[in-house]
Amino acid sequence: MTRSASKVARTPRAFVRLVSHDETRADWTLPVIDEVKRLGCHWACSHREARRPRSISDGDIIFMARIVDHPHNILVYGRALAMKHVTGRDSATGADIELRPWKAEWPCYIRLRHPEFVDGTIADGVPLFAMMDELAEKTFTSTKRNAKNGNGNIDPKRAYWHQPSMELTPDATKWLSARLEHAFVQHGRISRRTLALLDWPEGWGPLSR
């Protein structure tokens, strides 16, 4: 058996990511397409320089979410496949910052492939608190590990507080994927034609591999 053939294929991990660059809370009636345009999350998630995203690998799943208020919750409205961060390549350009000035403080990218978004409002997304209530410590890899070890925080709502992203357990990935698929069936996906009209880096697009 060759060395390459003997390697065990890596199972993609899944993360839920608060895509917004600020801590403001959205209204439930915010159209998803407006959030996508504002953040540019059709092709990248942005991170601060001090928190350069080293843990994300090619093919990992990124579920995109936004904090909402009245009532308070976190709603997942889209997903995409990640590309591993490469220093230099995945940094905001002057043109990027001119278009979205906040990227001066959030210049590090995780590029995204095959984005899918609910074609509706943020309210049509999947409420993350429902998953946390049902799965409890089995929501995140960190809380599941803490429960197994008998120490540390096992409350998923506390674990997520002020964290830009959290790794999901396989159970949580399955739970969230099923309900997001249901949201796509109910409300549709934002079309590739619509996404193609948004700003894209040169050589990049909604069908990029």
Tell me what each language-model feature is:
Residues N73-Y77, L81-P170:
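Aromatic- and Lys/Arg-enriched surface recognition patch
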Residues R66-H72:
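Short, charged beta-turn/beta-strand-edge "cap" motif at the junction between a beta-strand
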